[in-house]
Amino acid sequence: MYSLARPFLFSLDAERAHGLGLSALDLAYRTGTTPLLAARIAPMPSTVFGLTFPNPVGLAAGLDKNGEHIDALFALGFGFVEIGTITPRPQAGNPQPRLFRLPEHNAIINRMGFNNAGVDALVRNVERARNRRGLLGINIGKNKDTPNEQAVDDYIACLDKVYPLADYITVNISSPNTAGLRELQEETALRQLVSQLRDRQEDLAARHGRRVPMLVKVAPDLSDRDIDAAARVLGELQVDGVIATNTTIDHSKVAGDPLANEAGGLSGAPVLEQSTLVLRRLRSRLPESVPLVGVGGILSGADAVAKMAAGAALVQCYSGLIFRGPALVSECVEAIRRRREAPSRGAVAPL
């Protein structure tokens, strides 16, 4: 079914196609026709962060920024769906055009800039969702006009409001499309930010009688030294998990494409290798008690298995969904299922 719709969607402006595609998913969900788009997936429970996921394949943040399509996205078979990135106040993001497909490379460049309706709107949308078939992650960020020195206030504002509704929360400090945001990954800034968020997390756990795991999402463009420093900080602060990785600012893998010089983060097939290298190095540096979520360049079941072999406990896709359609979800789940049945093939490769 998606193979029939894709040529039409790809004939449209990428951001318009994004909205139209989500509307179509909502319609399919309401009319009970989602099975025409996505195969039924047998359960494959995976316990990570103390949570049991129906299966280990999730949707990465960015597709549903405001949590408006939760039920429809779960109907595609994802074991978990991550919504956001959300900020305390609504913001328009960067000027359009800001989303570009590179079909020859199975890649996307985006410079969206955390466009979203604000955390209060997301909370209302999550409260309206009625059929959460998996676990819900909420990805939080800071407003563009909030200086890094005050970034913790934005993250705490979001953390407080989404905590009662989320199964887990992701702290996004790695988008390349908010000026200066990635500076929060520097060792001193990272320690200062995450230590305050960890304190708030424990306060909220006591207040709500429920501990919601908090993850940190990192960039693929970190040097080995920066990766090691981040692992040291995040391990010492006992974060619940790390998502590796966000989009890359390195466009060398798409050099020569007419859109290669568009500013923004590159995702899709060209980021697979580098994001997996970062994942593998983090796994070797972090305590085993800190699970990893592998994301970046998953366009096949084999790609998902490669992430697991590099040390991921869960995987996420986004760009792959755009190029492959909903069939990618079941393909990834079944590939991981086969790997579980033959675990000798899943040893973490050395650096």
Curated annotation (Swiss-Prot):
Active-site residues, record numbering mapped to chain: 175 (nucleophile)
Annotated positions binding substrate: 65, 110-114, 172, 177, 246-247
Subcellular location: Cell membrane
GO CC terms: cytoplasm; plasma membrane
Signal peptide: none
First-level EC class: oxidoreductase
Pathway: Pyrimidine metabolism; UMP biosynthesis via de novo pathway; orotate from (S)-dihydroorotate (quinone route): step 1/1
Protein name according to UniProt: Dihydroorotate dehydrogenase (quinone)
